[in-house]
Amino acid sequence: MSIFNKVTKSFQWGDKTVVMETGEIARQASGAVLVNIDDTVVLATVVGSKQAKPGQDFFPLTVDYIEKTYAAGKIPGSFFKREAKPSELETLTSRLIDRPIRPLFPEGFYNEVHVVIHTISLNPEVDADIAAMIAVSAALSVSGIPFNGPIGAARVGYVNGEYVLNPGQTARKSSQLDLVVAGTEAAVLMVESEAQQLSEEIMLGAVVFGHEQGKVAINAIHELVRDAGKPVWDWQPPAKDETFIAKVTALAEGKLRAAYQIRSKQARTQALREASASVLESLKGEGVEFDAVKVEALLFDIEAKIVRSQILAGEPRIDGRDTRTVRPIEIRNSVLPRTHGSALFTRGETQALVVSTLGTERDAQRIDALAGEFEDRFIFHYNMPPFATGEVGRMGSTKRREIGHGRLAKRALVACLPSKDEFPYTIRVVSEITESNGSSSMASVCGGCLSLMDAGVPMKAHVAGIAMGLIKEDNRFAVLTDILGDEDHLGDMDFKVAGTTNGITALQMDIKIQGITKEIMQVALAQAKEARMHILGKMQEAMGEAKTEISSFAPKLYTMKINPEKIRDVIGKGGATIRALTDETGCQINIEEDGTITIAATEAAKADEAKRRIEEITAEVEVGKIYEGPVTKILDFGALINLLPGKDGLLHISQIAHERVEKVGDYLQEGQIVKVKVLETDDKGRVKLSMKALADRPAGDSGRPAPAERGERRERRDGGASEQQQQ
């Protein structure tokens, strides 16, 4: 009899088999499910506190996605040989899981919930993020924690005009789309994607396709819950004090309505603070006992009702616009004098100072991912300091939100970057958000494109982004173009679309409610396209095309090709040759396995010198050609002459002069510069040289020693021997 009460469910999902297990591992967690998809194994655990902390006024959900290096048969490369802080991929996956599950916890549920996902086995062809989302959905569903799930999730590719379910790494190389969608049976809740300039129709079709495929996982989770689910918690939302709500509403509504007639964000925020303080003072003055946290929550609800009702009634939005108008746009290029490329993009009260820097291949980011190492030559970083929203705050390590916004902007731009062959630079773009009132990530896309073009990057097309919002009550809804920060907080959807005049390059959607239909998404996409075209027009006016020359402060890249067999000659013993080249020419030199050499230099003359020296090193000695070089070594039977860098030839004693040479040192000295002709080379690379082939033959010299000469020499040799004998 086993001590485990193990329950297993398996199902076929496209061409993959999915197995879900619970009851054996991590039994003390509120819920734990192991998901195996073709050898990619993920363990998701969830623990919920039975009681909320006193004074808690928000839902404290934490999602931690962790990849274990042993999952891919690796040992961590750090000094301590253990997993350290989360990688960028782990942070992004944590956000990907958090976004669709957060709206499904009931309103007023403020108990702490911690979701931890471990990837413990990885098949490189099966992404762990989809397995993790299914495992989390199942773990929450069996835990008994109040949760209006389960959710399903799927990855969608687009290959040869057809949608592909959960494509692996290999299939994605030929796919025009990488889209992840998550949602319940009834509605889509989250979309994250990048695309190769695809139409709105294709993108919407991918969302619908992925949502339908996700329902297969939802059905399997329902079966798992039926056999292994724990009792649902007996949790009820706190009872509402209607009398107190009416009291606060009476005190606050007029002041809040007046505040939302103010168009400036700073002035409006100040008016809202004063309204809140006034309500608290009035309650104190009347002797009413209250919890300040609850009062603030009530004020937020009143604000939401005011703003939402005004928009649905067709009244102007918070800043006076209608639902389709984009805020005023100002663009300035080449803002910073010594950077490689820069742009200041301002849209209303949202502003991004975006800077592009060009580097060499050595500057590429080397990423040691679980599925394998690779180099990333396009880096995008997004920073948003507290002053951007007029707040006091701490400056510290990069936050999850900043990593997520940077990745979204990168997804939007990467489809329009030139290939490595066209533009071999490593590119880093940094977006500094200097003002923020909604849609700063999309301002980063616009500013990023302009700064890249300012840096001389030949972009395939201008790329612009826009954030859309939604207000929905029953059957009435309004789609909002270019949402403000307040409209984001008070609305039902955050829908970001980036692309070119030809199509969409990135799409991100987060929906806070259920019931968003395909028709609503169609309206949102059509309205987003209209706004995108408007912004693209403004960008094209400011910068019609990329600069034809890169900044004088950026490194210039020059490429050349050598025989791959000559690579070791350029590198030299222990790297001595390549080090000398870089030190003496002031260039960076990168050599690839196929013999492609990239020279990075700030001046053309330095690059030319490096190229000349590499050509010398890699040049082949030609038979019949005359070379001039120093004598490097004197031998008894000849001398070694340096013809090319690292290439010597043998000048035999018989080839030094037409007359007989008794001693090489009588004719040559080390360091002496001589002219020689190449007589022949053999298959081992040995070179035979001649000096006498270049010298005029003495008059009457047949080239053979005369008999008398030969006799005299014999006599001298004989005489010498006799003298020795006599002695």
From Swiss-Prot:
Primary role: Involved in mRNA degradation. Catalyzes the phosphorolysis of single-stranded polyribonucleotides processively in the 3'- to 5'-direction.
One Pfam family in the UniProt entry: PNPase
Bias (Basic and acidic residues): 707-720
Catalytic reaction annotation: RNA(n+1) + phosphate = RNA(n) + a ribonucleoside 5'-diphosphate
Signal peptide (from-to): none
Biological processes annotated in GO: mRNA catabolic process; RNA processing
S1 motif domain span: 624-692
Cofactor(s) required, per the database record: Mg(2+)
Ranges where the record places region Disordered: 691-727
Protein name (Swiss-Prot/TrEMBL): Polyribonucleotide nucleotidyltransferase
GO cellular component terms, semicolon-separated: cytosol
Annotated KH domain residues: 555-614
Predominant location: cytoplasm
Organism: Acidovorax sp. (strain JS42)
Binding site for Mg(2+): 488, 494
Alphabetized CDD domains for the sequence: KH-I_PNPase, RNase_PH_PNPase_1, RNase_PH_PNPase_2, S1_PNPase
Enzyme class: transferase
